[in-house]
Amino acid sequence: MQTLTKFKVSGKQTLAYTKQERINVGDIEGHILSLIEAKGVNVSTGKIEYMNGGQVVNLVTSDLVNFSGPIQGYSIVKKKEDSAIGKLEGKIITELSSEGTPVAVIEANLTWIKGTGQFKNIQGVVTAKGRYISENIYIVEWEGEYWIEK
């Protein structure tokens, strides 16, 4: 039986909203459903390079109360002929800082589900943590491992 080679990778992404739809649910104050598209760039930070300079598109839905709650969606990274698509699930937690301003942090897990080019048949997992640096811009640091199914 052949053993799969696993690659440990990590990176940092800076993303900005390019589309956003928010709908007030109306049951309790501050309850919204949200759909965003965010675009940005991936910077590889690990020993093994992964999609350094790749273009990132995140498509995320959320069910938030006072900007805290579950998120899910997809993250797509492309660089030339290579791409990797991951399904993500996680949460946004928004709290007030000591200065009284909202601080939103993101925690998510991603499972790679599809790839092209050198990432065709990609499988693997990622953990990610991020923070908003403005209302519509966020930074995510991630690490994980992948392998290519034969």
Q: Which sequence ranges carry the predicted segments?
A:
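Beta-strand-enriched cores of mature, soluble protein domains
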Residues: 1-150
